[in-house]
Amino acid sequence: MHFRKKYEEKLALSSLRKRINRMALTDQKLRYARAQADSKEERQRVSHEIHVADSLNRVEVKAILRQYGWPGISDIGKDGQNNFWLLAQHADDDPEFQQAALAAMQKLKKTGEINLDNYAFLYDRVQYNLNYRQWYGTQVNWTAHGKANGFRPIADEAGVDRSRIACIQGVIDVLNFAAR
């Protein structure tokens, strides 16, 4: 308990972190419930609940993005930043918003304030939602039961590992600078 309080005191926006983490917890509980559903009807019911939750979360995430830009790790912690990304990632009904979120995230790409894996995932999600091929190979097709079933189209399958390495180069540069 003491450690968590000390950690939260170091964050610039700890109350925002809590708000984001609550939304993400609901998001994940619903998706888990859908994956565990025993019938088509139950999956459809939970899918509707997910759609409603995603819509409400998107309104909140848009407001946060307008007020703060993309909150970094020093603002809301690694968990908060990962969960903020998750909520943007699940805003598939609004690819224009996802593009705006990606642009805000892009500004922090070389600062160490974001998880670059999340950047790659959101980049590919935006590409897919705009009917383009993904670059980093992060997006997969899903079965009705929530099982991964092969990659969605990749722009350069032979070079996808190079793309992934290039994405994390910013982290390597930051670490090398910090080590000096």
Positions of PLM-derived features:
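Alpha-helical solenoid repeat scaffolds
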Residues: 1, 119-129, 154, 179-180
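Alpha-helical protein-protein interaction modules
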Residues: 112, 118, 130-132, 140-151
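Alpha-helical repeat scaffolds
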Residues: 64-65, 98-106
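Preference for long, solvent-exposed alpha-helical segments and helix-linker "stalks"
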Residues: 1-81, 90-92, 109-113, 122
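Short coil/turn connectors between adjacent alpha-helices in alpha-solenoid helical repeat scaffolds
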Residues: 93-97
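Charge-rich, acidic-biased intrinsically disordered regions
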Residues: 76-83, 122-134, 143
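A cross-kingdom marker for long, charged
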Residues: 137, 141-180
